């Protein structure tokens, strides 16, 4: 930085000397006047050449940053402005003219930033639909079948590739409730899809620190790891890093379980987890999941900063049964509407399950029945999710 100032207008020798002598009687008035006048003359001789060459009046106090500083400051200002704008942004719901019941009750969130074209074909594959049936033709997953043809997007849940990556666009994915982001590596130019976090927009730069701290970041910190600077640089929205590098209390998503595995938890729309504690002696961390359950994960497991995008997915209304069929979801028949041979609630005169407890088609109790007992308990679970009146909404 080049700092230019003026002592001509700011320092009037007589007034300044009188002010100093009044506050400090030990300094004589005459000596102060001579000293100040000499300093002003020396300053004028030294700065007259610089002022004439730069065409800057000495009365003006200006700070002229370097080109690199200007670029950095502009980027920071743009980022802050965009975050303020996003914080005030309210998602509008799409409503259609109520010509029919299916249009009357249809609600869908509007996201103007979504890309309207086709996905990158090299990052998609064709997956044949099986209608919820296994290799022997038996239904193993109910309520599946039909639906519109689509290609499965290949999502990078591991994020092993380091270096800065720029978000090209945010896309709709028919295979999941969240949105996805197309990334382009700034060095190699390689394309990849990741789960988009809330607030991620085209032009943003994200980075993965799963393989460690890059040398460029170490050089910025002076060759030594400064925890404060490292936390500010790495814990940005959309960045992927080990849980050992994430501060306690940070909101994360796409949380892994093992040191080398992909992200497993909190991948659907609007979900997130929170880092509660780190236990270096056990090489584990405690994470609170979306359900409220506290769970152990590896301290070197992967996680991404932020909340999963498409938070208003829960507020949508399909409006009619046909839209569920377009999504590949078949109807769910009530047990009391079935025959006795098909469901424990079936049969009888009228639609009543009699005095039986609610249960599944295979006789398993549906309300309050614990399915894990004894040695089959999950050892990684620290605290069970809240139930009943304490359940999370």
Curated annotation (Swiss-Prot):
Residues 381-393 have a biased composition (Basic and acidic residues). The keyword Transcription regulation does not apply. GO terms for biological process: mitochondrial translation. It is found in: Mitochondrion. SUPFAM superfamilies: Nucleic acid-binding proteins, Translation proteins SH3-like domain. The keyword Repeat does not apply. Residues 1-43 form a transit peptide. GO terms for cellular component: mitochondrial inner membrane; mitochondrial large ribosomal subunit; mitochondrion. Residues 337-393 are annotated as: Disordered. Residues 369-380 have a biased composition (Basic residues). InterPro entries: NA-bd_OB-fold, Rib_uL2_dom2, Ribosomal_uL2, Ribosomal_uL2_bac/org-type, Ribosomal_uL2_C, Ribosomal_uL2_CS, Ribosomal_uL2_dom3, Ribosomal_uL2_RNA-bd_dom. GO terms for molecular function: RNA binding; structural constituent of ribosome; transferase activity. Keywords: Mitochondrion, Ribonucleoprotein, Ribosomal protein, Transit peptide. Component of the mitochondrial large ribosomal subunit (mt-LSU). Mature yeast 74S mitochondrial ribosomes consist of a small (37S) and a large (54S) subunit. The 37S small subunit contains a 15S ribosomal RNA (15S mt-rRNA) and 34 different proteins. The 54S large subunit contains a 21S rRNA (21S mt-rRNA) and 46 different proteins. uL2m has a Na/K ligand binding site. Component of the mitochondrial ribosome (mitoribosome), a dedicated translation machinery responsible for the synthesis of mitochondrial genome-encoded proteins, including at least some of the essential transmembrane subunits of the mitochondrial respiratory chain. The mitoribosomes are attached to the mitochondrial inner membrane and translation products are cotranslationally integrated into the membrane. Present with 1600 molecules/cell in log phase SD medium. Belongs to the universal ribosomal protein uL2 family. This is Large ribosomal subunit protein uL2m.
